[in-house]
């Protein structure tokens, strides 16, 4: 089989040449072990009786899916005092736990029991975060693309990442074409079935046929609705929290002035920005080459201009136009 032939990887088909280039890029620099340090360090080995939370502080990275939370996490990991890993999805555990507390007569009638139960749940989550992250870091983080509320990690500082909803839509659509089992309804939408077959055969199908990517009106409208709803919920949650707990970060600002934005990130956690490592190939804005069938595909701003037809734009703005305007995006 030659490199130009198409092979099957269990999700969709990809060009071997693209995959080989991706692997070469990932090997370019050992600096990737800095940005991804939770993966490259041994687990903390606690001594008997040791409190592994002692001296640790906590933060979370939140934002709608495909808003760049992975990149933000890697930027934070360039600082020796910070370690961020994902995705814990604590809300999926804490939500049912809190509901159980609320619905139990025992927890509500026995004075102080509900509070003590929640304190122990919070400690369990934080201990898991410490074990998953770099043992020498002071600031321990969880990167999960989710809403700010409920803020299940008590007293954690919050990075709220926001990205142009149109670029989110493009990235999200590519993501579901690459991983259709993540959202089965997507692959079952009649407009997407043919496109999925085409994409499996040629990973550059949408680059060659850009008007096809956002051709499913139902998915465009659903995505616009969910994105706008997430922004609204996060805005409300932010207003209910002290200013020092939340830092709003725009994806586009990271691209345009990454030096100043990195300074903001580190200063929010009260660490010295000058101690952070230099940017490397996997933390600089964007990628050297677009690889349509990779999780980290392009990392660009304004990519929606390549794919959004007038019909898709109308469908998107119908559900998210007001939110785009409130955030200051030109429409």
Regions found by a protein language model. Name each.
Residues 116-124, 140-143, 215, 219-230, ...:
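Soluble or luminal CAZymes and related metallo-dependent hydrolases
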Residues 86, 169-173, 308, 328:
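Short, flexible helix/strand-to-coil boundary loops that buttress conserved ligand/catalytic motifs
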Residues 145-276, 294-295:
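PAPS-dependent sulfotransferase catalytic domain
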Residues 58-60, 138-141, 246-247:
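Residue-level preference for the first positions of well-ordered beta-strands
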Residues 1-130, 134, 174, 178-182, 189-207, 278-323, ...:
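PAPS-dependent sulfotransferase catalytic core
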Residues 268, 323-326:
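C-terminal alpha-helix
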Residues 127-149:
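Glycine-rich phosphate-binding loop used to anchor ATP phosphates in small-molecule kinases
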């Amino acid at each position: 089989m030659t490199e130009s032939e198409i092979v099957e990887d269990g999700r969709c088909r990809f060009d071997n040449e693209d995959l080989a280039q991706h692997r070469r890029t990932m090997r370019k620099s050992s600096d990737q072990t800095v940005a991804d340090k939770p993966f490259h360090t041994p687990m903390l080995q606690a001594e008997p009786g040791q409190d592994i939370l002692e001296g640790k502080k906590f933060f979370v990275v939140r934002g709608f899916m495909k808003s760049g939370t992975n990149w933000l996490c890697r930027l934070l990991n360039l600082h020796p005092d910070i370690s961020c890993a994902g995705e814990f999805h604590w809300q999926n555990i804490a939500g049912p736990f809190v509901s159980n507390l609320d619905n139990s007569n025992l927890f509500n009638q026995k004075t102080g029991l509900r509070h003590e139960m929640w304190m122990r749940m919070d400690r369990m989550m934080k201990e898991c975060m410490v074990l998953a992250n770099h043992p020498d870091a002071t600031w321990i983080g969880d990167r999960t693309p989710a809403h700010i509320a409920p803020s299940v990690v008590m007293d954690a500082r919050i990075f709220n990442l926001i990205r142009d909803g149109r670029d989110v839509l493009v990235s999200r659509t590519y993501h579901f074409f690459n991983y259709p089992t993540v959202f089965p309804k997507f692959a079952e939408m009649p407009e997407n079935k043919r496109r999925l077959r085409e994409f499996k055969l040629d990973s550059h199908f949408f680059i060659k046929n850009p008007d096809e990517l956002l051709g499913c009106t139902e998915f465009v409208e659903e995505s616009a609705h969910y994105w706008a709803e997430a922004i609204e919920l996060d805005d409300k949650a932010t207003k209910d929290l002290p200013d020092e707990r939340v830092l709003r970060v725009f994806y586009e600002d990271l691209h345009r002035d990454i030096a100043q934005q990195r300074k903001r990130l580190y200063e929010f956690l009260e660490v010295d920005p000058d101690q952070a490592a230099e940017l490397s190939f996997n933390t600089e804005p964007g990628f050297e080459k677009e690889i349509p069938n990779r999780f980290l595909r392009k990392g660009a701003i304004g990519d929606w201009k390549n794919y959004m037809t007038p019909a898709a734009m109308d469908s998107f703005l119908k559900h998210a136009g007001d939110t785009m305007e409130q955030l200051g995006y030109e429409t």
